[in-house]
UniProtKB/Swiss-Prot annotation:
Glycans are attached at residues 129, 159. Residues 1-9, 71-93, 183-202 are cytoplasmic. The chain crosses the membrane at residues 10-30, 50-70, 94-114, 162-182. GO terms for cellular component: membrane. Keywords: Glycoprotein, Membrane, Transmembrane, Transmembrane helix. The keyword Coiled coil does not apply. Present in high molecular weight complexes in tumor cells. Interacts with SDCBP2. The keyword Transmembrane helix applies. It is found in: Membrane. Residues 31-49, 115-161 are extracellular. This is Transmembrane 4 L6 family member 1. The gene is TM4SF1. Belongs to the L6 tetraspanin family. Its main location: membrane.
Length: 202
């Protein structure tokens, strides 16, 4: 069972997704490219949870680099029974993947909550509040209500787009890390079987 190509592909993909998550999260701090809303604390509370920077970003880069570090390893030893050290290698990849699952899961949850609550925005009376907090996310299906937010301009579109990106990327990261966990378990079982086969051959 050769899994080096799969692990390498997962590692490279996670690096790309992690960078995109970090960028998306950073953009949430600057609606319309302006910094004043962050200084004045007029951003969604979930922006400050660092879901994309920490969860979908840094906690994904860790397993990604672990997987890329394994690409030079011989992961095809199951057929030739060259399995010494394989179990330790696979265990490290599983542990790294579990960290990735935790990080991506956090990213998905926070992004979903951010979408459900909606942005913090200024209404027609100049009051800042969560206009869509009590809609249970139904505002997402009715764009005609988005005009209730007067400031920042297009803040609903900004939040919906970026939180949706974080939600999608976090979901993809979760799936890839889960695949690597399954891959590592199967590789470990394969290595275990080979070690017993070696004993019988001796």
């Amino acid at each position: 069972m050769c899994s080096s190509k799969c692990t390498r592909y997962i590692g490279h993909s996670l690096v790309v997704f992690a960078v995109l998550c970090i960028v998306a999260n950073i953009l949430l701090y600057f609606p319309n490219g302006e910094t004043k809303y962050a200084y004045e604390d007029h951003l969604s509370r979930f922006v400050w949870f660092f879901a994309g920077i920490v969860g979908g970003g840094l906690l994904i880069l860790l397993p990604a680099f672990v997987f890329l570090g394994l690409e030079g390893e011989d992961c095809c030893g199951c057929w030739s029974c060259e399995n010494y050290g394989k179990r330790c290698t696979m265990l490290s990849s599983i542990m790294a993947a579990l960290i990735g699952i935790a990080g991506s899961g956090y990213c998905v949850i926070v992004a979903a909550l951010g979408l459900a609550e909606g942005p913090k925005c200024g209404d027609s009376h100049g009051m800042w509040n969560y206009t869509f907090a009590n809609t249970d996310g139904q505002y997402l299906l009715d764009p005609t209500t988005w005009s209730k937010c007067h400031e920042p301009n297009n803040i609903v579109e900004w939040n919906v787009t970026l939180f949706s990106i974080l939600l999608a990327l976090g979901g993809l990261e979760f799936i890839l890390c889960l695949i690597q966990v399954i891959n590592g378990v199967l590789e470990g079982m394969c290595s275990y079987c080979c070690s017993h086969q070696q004993q019988y051959d001796c």
